[in-house]
Regions:
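Active-site rim helix/loop that mediates acceptor-substrate recognition in acyltransferases
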Residues: 10-11, 15-55, 159-182, 186
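Amide-forming acyltransferase catalytic core, primarily the GNAT-like/NAT-type
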Residues: 13, 117-202
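Conserved beta-strand in the GNAT
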Residues: 42, 48-57, 64-69, 190-201, ...
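A short, internal acetyl-CoA/4′-phosphopantetheine-binding micro-motif in the GNAT/acyltransferase core
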Residues: 44, 68-75, 203-217, 238
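Conserved beta-strand-loop-alpha-helix junction that forms the acyl-donor binding cleft
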Residues: 71, 101-110, 129-133, 235-245
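Conserved acetyl-CoA pyrophosphate-binding loop and the N-cap/start of the following alpha-helix
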Residues: 74, 78-86, 215-223
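Conserved GNAT acetyl-CoA-binding A-motif
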Residues: 91-102, 125, 229-239
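Conserved catalytic-core motifs of GNAT/GCN5-like acyltransferases
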Residues: 100-104, 115, 120-133, 254-265
Length: 282
């Protein structure tokens, strides 16, 4: 069975999250309660013992499955499939028809599971750690752009331009600790697809980090740096674009994680309503 997480479940998150090997730190209880716990479901067996957890972000017909973790002694017993089936049932109940997640390509068992439930690989994403002095070496383009904070009126255009699920930006805006930035060409202010990032100064990192061209990364990074904490000599970001990944590798960016982004329809009976088709990217 699945149940919503409670403050007491931080111990399960803290025990299981490192097994995902993302390289990210375990959040302390207060930050976990503010950021991850609201979307976390705890999986229990028939005796009330915790066997794993899932962290979900549900957005207007789309679900981003952020974490899936199973207790080590319960792996290889079909528990992962049971957890995903239970998640799918919950999503169907709220008319959520699409889901996506990230998985390491070397985790062959997980990749097989996700393919078995209808997901396919859409692209590869690479998480980087980049010292700010290295970021200054990224090649710049000739296009004149400025950075600005994202206004709610800009959300739909940015989401459409970067094939993001509707509501993702509004969901990020609910967290006052996040900084939402976009790039604007003064000569073409209606062009919403130049650059967009959500920056977490406490992490510190940017995800999503989207640019129309790798040469637009420098001005977006410069805007992010204006919001960094004084004790932060580096930035972490996720590239979902081959040209940007190549540019970051060329200047010596450190790869922290490479993953497949997989997505598909939530399996099971058709929902009572039929939301519009969702973009491939979450």
């Amino acid at each position: 069975m699945l149940r919503p997480a409670t403050p007491a479940d931080h111990v399960h998150y803290a025990r299981l999250f490192p097994d995902l090997a993302t390289g990210d730190p375990v959040l302390p209880p207060d930050r976990w309660l503010d950021t991850i716990a609201p979307g976390t479901l705890i999986a229990e067996d028939g005796h009330g013992s915790v066997i794993g957890y899932a962290y979900l972000q549900i957005l207007q017909g789309n679900c981003y499955v952020r974490h899936v973790a199973i207790e080590p002694d319960r792996r290889g017993q079909g528990r992962g499939r049971m957890l995903m089936d239970a998640i799918a049932a919950r999503l169907r109940a709220v008319d959520c028809t699409r889901w996506c997640l990230n998985v390491k390509p070397e985790n062959e068992a997980a990749v097989r599971l996700y393919r078995a439930i209808g997901m396919t690989t859409r692209h590869t994403m690479t998480a980087f750690r980049l010292d700010w002095d290295l970021a200054a070496r990224l090649p710049r383009g000739d296009r004149s752009v400025i950075a600005s904070l994202v206004a709610p009126a800009d959300d739909a255009a940015i989401e459409a331009a970067f094939a993001m699920p509707a509501g993702q930006i509004a969901e990020a805006r609910k967290r006052p600790d996040l900084v939402l930035l976009r790039l604007v060409d003064p000569a073409r202010p209606d062009d919403a697809g130049l650059g967009f990032a959500v920056y977490d100064p406490l992490f510190p990192g940017a995800f999503p980090f989207r640019v129309a061209a790798a040469t637009l990364a420098p001005p977006l990074l410069a805007a992010i740096r204006a919001h960094e904490r004084p004790d932060t000599p580096y930035i972490q970001l996720v590239s979902e674009d081959a040209d940007l990944t190549a540019a970051l590798l060329a200047i010596g960016g450190t790869v922290r994680l490479s993953a497949l982004h997989m997505a598909g329809d939530v399996p099971g009976p058709a929902p009572s309503r039929h939301p519009p088709s969702a973009p491939d990217r979450c």
